[in-house]
Amino acid sequence: MKRKKITIVGAGNVGATCAHWAAAKELGDIVLIDVAEGIPQGKALDLMEAAPVEGYDSVIIGTNDYADTADSDVVVITAGVARKPGMSRDDLLNINAGIVRKVTEEIVKYSPNAYLLIVTNPVDVSAYIAYKASGFSANRVFGLSGVLDSARFRTFIARELNVSFEDVISFVLGGHGDDMVPMVRYTYVGGIPVEKLIPTDRLEAMVERARKGGAEIVNYLKTGSAYYAPSASVMQMAECILKDKKRILPVSAFLQGEYGESDVFSGVPAIIGGDGVEKIIELDLDDEEMAALRKSINSVRNNISKLG
């Protein structure tokens, strides 16, 4: 039986950590590709030399040649410029748009049947670019958004209540930016609505912290951005495809009438399985929640309109 093949584009902190998660989860063989000579090769060799210690059997190679990525099942695109203190995800728009377009064209040439998972910020716009550049069906291109944003929100709730992280379930909708919409009404702790456990003012503070979660880490690091949680989140998405897990996850998916929106990517709950985004789930939103989602999606549309 042939192993699955995962290509990770970009050998920076996010990409290399994605490769580590993929190997640790035994998701398949891994290709780490980057324009910088020596970086993907060195990191791939380092990761493979950890295999005897960690007990995985993934073959990991580093390369600068897209021919080595041929016939990939899943491609994770992390390539791009990282945020610096004071920058928003949207500030990266024009720089990263060209990178994502070029990478996508190379990937399609060698892996026409792959699923594309987009991490490059601003994620929702990058996913739109990759979708248009690839010519793939909408189910095969989606971005990291709500899995990461929800993980941050869940972390803050679990720490507030001193309970297991696993017992907190939540969704974050909308674009992966400052207008994201943490869904307090759909947040549960061990099956109990979170609003029954945490006062409103504390919840509002956690919502705001989740929105600024990436910037908080950027401000600490000074010269980089988050990578452990983003890479863990996107590899959870990859695992759902490769193992046909059919989990309901909030991802940046292409909307075709759902939530009254079309021709735009936004974070929404979806069933993720062997066929990628198999179904987008439409939550029953009240007027305030829908208005917040519309505002978030309009921010994504505004950025798309700025593309050259």
Curated annotation (Swiss-Prot):
Positions that bind NAD(+): G10, A11, G12, N13, V14, G15, D34, N96, V119, T120, N121
InterPro entries documented for this protein: L-lactate/malate_DH (IPR001557), Lactate/malate_DH_C (IPR022383), Lactate/malate_DH_N (IPR001236), Lactate_DH/Glyco_Ohase_4_C (IPR015955), Malate_DH_type3 (IPR011275), NAD(P)-bd_dom_sf (IPR036291)
Entry's Gene Ontology BP terms: lactate metabolic process; tricarboxylic acid cycle
Organism superkingdom: Bacteria
Record's catalysed reaction(s): (S)-malate + NAD(+) = oxaloacetate + NADH + H(+)
Function: Catalyzes the reversible oxidation of malate to oxaloacetate.
Listed HAMAP family: Malate_dehydrog_3 (MF_00487)
Name under which the protein is recorded: Malate dehydrogenase
Organism: Desulforamulus reducens (strain ATCC BAA-1160 / DSM 100696 / MI-1) (Desulfotomaculum reducens)
